[in-house]
Amino acid sequence: RPRRFSATEIDDWIADPYSLYAKRILQLRPQEDLDRPIDAALRGNLVHDALAAFLKDHPAGSLPEDALARLRATARRLFEPYWQNPTMRHFWWPAFETISAWFIETEVNRRATILESHAEIKGRIEVEAPAGPVIFTARADRIDRLAGGGLAVLDYKTGRAPTKAAVAKRRRTQLLVESVIAARGGFEGLDSAVVEAMEYWR
């Protein structure tokens, strides 16, 4: 019986228990696609990686005047292996230019309310259960230490974000699990603190 679950697996468990059974009990895995298509999942990974790299370079304090140019340069290097694909050049890159402009504008204003940002940060907690301890893990897109000492847990979505109803009914629990781990001090380099905000950025 599995005793370790990631935050994303909890959502899978709720939505489709058999998929988790197939993965964790039957050990079934989809075959690797040797010629991966340019799809929405790849686009999401590239955007996440670009934003994470930028935040790791600028975790605290005011942003440099050329912040937008730096973010786009970082993203351009990540997009480069797929640049010959017309969809990448003519659709995804223009979309990222729009995303990056919004991100930097938002970030400039946000820096007045935060002490530091942690991007792509790993965390885990152990919870006692009747059959023995269960470990919950997560890799948060971003956690900010707020000026007042609390935390804000953020998740980037390049596709559709969960609805408020789905989160309220605990049908989408990724941010909730990450917030519990954060509140208990389970993320690397972050002391326990009150989680004051959970946000989806799309």
Model regions: which residues?
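Active-site-adjacent bridging/hinge elements
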Residues: 17-28, 71-76, 144-157, 202
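Substrate-binding beta-hairpin/strand module that engages nucleic acids
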Residues: 66, 116-117, 179-202
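A non-catalytic, helix-rich entry segment at domain boundaries
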Residues: 46-128
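C-terminal, charged and often intrinsically disordered regions of DNA end-processing helicases
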Residues: 1-53
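Active-site-proximal structural scaffolding
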Residues: 3-6, 14-15, 40-44, 64, ...
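Short, polar/flexible loop-turn hinges at active-site or ligand-entry regions and domain interfaces
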Residues: 28-36, 57-63, 187-190
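Non-catalytic protein-protein interaction segments used by genome-maintenance enzymes to assemble
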Residues: 118-186
